[in-house]
Amino acid sequence: MTETTALASSTASSQPSSQASSQVLSLDLIITCADGLEAPLQTELTSFGIASEIKSTGRLAVTGTLRDLYKICLWSRVASRVLMLIKRKNINAEYDVAEQLYGLAKSVNWTEQFSLEQTFAIRLSVDKRVAVSQQFAMLRIKDAIADTFNEVYESRPNVDSKNPDFSVFATVNDKQAELYLDLSGTSLHRRGYRVAMTEAPLKENLAAALLYSAGWHKKNEAGDTPFYNALIDPMCGSGTFIIEALLMHCDYAVGIDKAANQFGFYEWQHHDAALWQEMIDDAQTRFRAALEIANEQPDTLPLIFGFDADNGAIIATEKNLIAAGLQDLLPLLDIETRALDQLSTLLKPLVADGRLSNPLIITNPPYGERLGDEEMIKPLYQSIGLILQDSFAGSGIDPMLGILASHVEQVDILPIREPKTLRCHNGAITVYFRYGTLIAGQTGNLVSRFEKREIEVEDGQDFINRLQKNLTRLKKLAKKDNVSNIRVYNADLPDFKVAIDLYGDYAHVQEYAPPKTIPPETAKKRFNLALMGIREVFGINREQIFIKTRARQSGNDQYSKQGNTEKRGKFYIAREDGAYLYVNFTDYLDTGLFIDHRNMRARIKDNSRNKSVLNLFAYTCTASVHAALAGAKKVTSVDLSQNYLDWGKQNFALNGLNVSSNKYQFVAADIFEWIKDNTEQFDIIFIDPPTFSNSKKFQGTFDVQRDHAALINRAMNRLTADGILYFSNNFTRFELDEQLTERYDIIDITQKTIGFDFDIKKPIHQSFEIRHRQSL
């Protein structure tokens, strides 16, 4: 059988000089790393001037000197362990494998590796194709080492399985067995700076590997300044990305903290203490010099931004920065409590004045295990992309974006150009790192891009002319108010009874059921002409048009799922006044966003800062989102439907709002019962009830004309003395109860809440501002 002995012999007691030792010993090393990090580790080793070969998952082979060994242990940010090959031997798996391992271990002179006074432990990895008791095989390797020492000293070193001075690693497959000595000691990922923790932290060497993958280590073409001028982590947790990025920039040897007593080679017979101390001194000098330059010339330090919605995470980050020896840089960093929804407000001025000319945005969002609610993960990742696109819109800057996720589908929705994906592990969790340049956000929408032109369509010319006339007028108003979701046609012509609403780049077309006097084939022909006209006027394809037939509603039809529809179950994103909102064009009669209440939501937003807000009949919580984005101190959304509240939660997450925060409550309950039993007071209350409801979830029915007075009276009991209640409804024949006007100060604000795209002479809704009557 073939045997290979990897370590050249050397006289241990002589402690050779630094130069001699590095020349005498030729070491066959295996550098281990977490699965998936082989390429970043190889990049790092190459930067050290050390050639390597990827042998298998998580293992790189290096043939090097003692200096190379020390350099990897001292400087590698990605490696997990450094194993030195002691001996390798071919085996026959059909024979007694445990005894073959004994023979292999017995052929090694262990007294040349460590002394009698030191403890050791055995670690064994066995291929599943090999039939052997792992425990017994480890025992036989231990026996071989003990027998070797007994033959020389008539005594043997002790075994310490928990905290040994040396760990002997053995690997066995169906053809070969190998013995290694662990010279790194404790895992190299431990830096020593993690004194404060947050939930599910990122391992240090994984963070470093991802920074390598994203190119943080690169310099500009001249080689004298960093390639990136800023690093932004919008959900920094305990600050691992920030700290690892700073340690890279400041030329910090991450093994310095372990240099006191934690390396496995300290008691090794071939350890060269003089060479090691020389390398430690050099590393410390380099770090001090880099810190001095950063403090004296702050412009040489990239801008560093670390944000988290959890103040505890920010405190942890600052503590860890100090523990990492970076306390002198704290005044130069922007580490603050800031929720994701506030990110764009900070970034836009920095982009505008050129301070973010080439940033790296890298983060580890609270995916899966950290977030806890799977339904919130997709909106969270979408919100990151949307907020960043908004922040860099029109700047000409293409930032690098790198984001971790627990499932690759989560990062598939990120707007990244030519994305790369790294599959790796954060501890036991498989994660995916998606990185690449951010795709610039689309500018404009169907309204803003509309240009009037000559279009000739037989039998449909009147419709096209009216639609273009409407759009010519609406385009100017939409641009003035920055509106992209509007109604552009509402049965203006008797022969074309449709309503056309635009949501960004999509057309939502509702066909009113024709009267019985119109033959079905005539109605169908006219509707098809309208669809053709819509495509011609907007220059859009069939996939951008969604069709519904609208008949007289009864009960809860407005909120019920539709039957024979196309493209079911897909949500699209509409933007309104700085908010992102999910809309569904197929599954329900309504889309999830009532565009006729656009001005009402703006009014609520303008009055919500530092206020407590209650949204009754909250539906998909669009008004609640606006209140939260405006800085409301608390927002409570109440609706009978849990499904719509879940939709509302996703709207919150889509805007970077933390639905787990105590600031935001989502309550599935009967409105009348809830406001009767709840005693909390609110500064702003919004009520937009259905015209009629007969839901099975509560007894009886709700009729807005019949029941609005009782509803408002109960709600006013929950309104603070100087608060405002906004009441709105879409019942065309609605009349406000006179007793309410006698009891409260009420202002009809319908004219102010009807948008420019709706007919004020035939208001689609009525709205009122209601306050407590003040005593004189």
From Swiss-Prot:
<dbReference type="InterPro" id="IPR019614">
    <property type="entry name" value="SAM-dep_methyl-trfase"/>
</dbReference>
<keyword id="KW-0808">Transferase</keyword>
<dbReference type="InterPro" id="IPR029063">
    <property type="entry name" value="SAM-dependent_MTases_sf"/>
</dbReference>
<keyword id="KW-0489">Methyltransferase</keyword>
<protein>
    <recommendedName>
        <fullName>Ribosomal RNA large subunit methyltransferase K/L</fullName>
        <ecNumber>2.1.1.173</ecNumber>
        <ecNumber>2.1.1.264</ecNumber>
    </recommendedName>
</protein>
<dbReference type="GO" id="GO:0052915">
    <property type="term" value="F:23S rRNA (guanine(2445)-N(2))-methyltransferase activity"/>
</dbReference>
<keyword id="KW-0698">rRNA processing</keyword>
<dbReference type="GO" id="GO:0003723">
    <property type="term" value="F:RNA binding"/>
</dbReference>
<dbReference type="InterPro" id="IPR053943">
    <property type="entry name" value="RlmKL-like_Mtase_CS"/>
</dbReference>
<feature type="domain" description="THUMP">
    <location>
        <begin position="68"/>
        <end position="183"/>
    </location>
</feature>
<comment type="similarity">
    <text>Belongs to the methyltransferase superfamily. RlmKL family.</text>
</comment>
<dbReference type="Pfam" id="PF02926">
    <property type="entry name" value="THUMP"/>
</dbReference>
<dbReference type="Pfam" id="PF01170">
    <property type="entry name" value="UPF0020"/>
</dbReference>
<dbReference type="InterPro" id="IPR000241">
    <property type="entry name" value="RlmKL-like_Mtase"/>
</dbReference>
<dbReference type="GO" id="GO:0005737">
    <property type="term" value="C:cytoplasm"/>
</dbReference>
<keyword id="KW-0694">RNA-binding</keyword>
<dbReference type="InterPro" id="IPR002052">
    <property type="entry name" value="DNA_methylase_N6_adenine_CS"/>
</dbReference>
<dbReference type="GO" id="GO:0070043">
    <property type="term" value="F:rRNA (guanine-N7-)-methyltransferase activity"/>
</dbReference>
<dbReference type="Pfam" id="PF22020">
    <property type="entry name" value="RlmL_1st"/>
</dbReference>
<dbReference type="InterPro" id="IPR017244">
    <property type="entry name" value="23SrRNA_methyltr_KL"/>
</dbReference>
<comment type="function">
    <text>Specifically methylates the guanine in position 2445 (m2G2445) and the guanine in position 2069 (m7G2069) of 23S rRNA.</text>
</comment>
<dbReference type="Pfam" id="PF10672">
    <property type="entry name" value="Methyltrans_SAM"/>
</dbReference>
<dbReference type="InterPro" id="IPR054170">
    <property type="entry name" value="RlmL_1st"/>
</dbReference>
<keyword id="KW-0949">S-adenosyl-L-methionine</keyword>
<keyword id="KW-0963">Cytoplasm</keyword>
<dbReference type="InterPro" id="IPR004114">
    <property type="entry name" value="THUMP_dom"/>
</dbReference>
